[in-house]
Amino acid sequence: MKIYLASGNVNKKREVQELLPSHTIVLPKDEGIEFDPEETGSTFFENAMIKAKALYHIVKAPVLADDSGLCVDFLNGAPGIHSARYGSIEGEHVSAEAGINKVLSELKGVKDRSARFACCMVCLLDENRFYSVQETCEGHITEAPSGSGGFGYDPIFFVEKFGKTFAELTSEQKNSISHRGRALFSISRFIKGS
């Protein structure tokens, strides 16, 4: 099945394609579609649904949308839904390095570095059928970035199970425990049953 991914992020596309290998995952920009809806929701679910509905109205085909982010306990859940824009002045996307540096500076000298990645994923098959799931992956924030894999905050997100940051894991290891991997596993069962 051809599934449109409501994103412009090629790294997300790669992860989704790895986890849904029997489907063809397409970004809007792959087909020349301009897509950048305003994420005005106050939760991961609301933002995922905004993206899913906006893209579905354009393509009239199955759409997968996620909204995910890093939630740090000491920062009261920040960056949260603002992870891609954390530290920006006018709400624009910031580089991964800028987001990482902001989180690390805010946690300087802090002992409680517990955090989680959260992902809410929505699969919209048609105007009447959708499925949503929210998953998390627990970990903590390191003192400094480590590893070159992954993307976003992966170099500072340490998971006990492997004793490494997400950026130090193979894609298979990361997908087996990540927030997005867990959500996609649930979504794949929904798609198969539909």
Curated annotation (Swiss-Prot):
Keywords of this entry: Hydrolase, Magnesium, Metal-binding, Nucleotide metabolism, Nucleotide-binding
Active site per UniProt: 67
Cofactor(s) listed: Mg(2+)
Cited InterPro entries: dITP/XTP_pyrophosphatase, ITPase-like_fam, RdgB/HAM1
UniProt record, GO biological process: nucleotide metabolic process; purine nucleoside triphosphate catabolic process
Superkingdom classification of source: Bacteria
Reactions catalysed, as given in the entry: XTP + H2O = XMP + diphosphate + H(+); dITP + H2O = dIMP + diphosphate + H(+); ITP + H2O = IMP + diphosphate + H(+)
Residues the entry annotates as binding substrate: 7-12, 68, 151-154, 174, 179-180
Transmembrane segments: none
One GO cellular component, as annotated: cytosol
Documented EC number(s): 3.6.1.66
Quaternary structure (record): Homodimer.
NCBIfam families: RdgB/HAM1 family non-canonical purine NTP pyrophosphatase
Protein name stated in the entry: dITP/XTP pyrophosphatase
Organism field: Treponema denticola (strain ATCC 35405 / DSM 14222 / CIP 103919 / JCM 8153 / KCTC 15104)
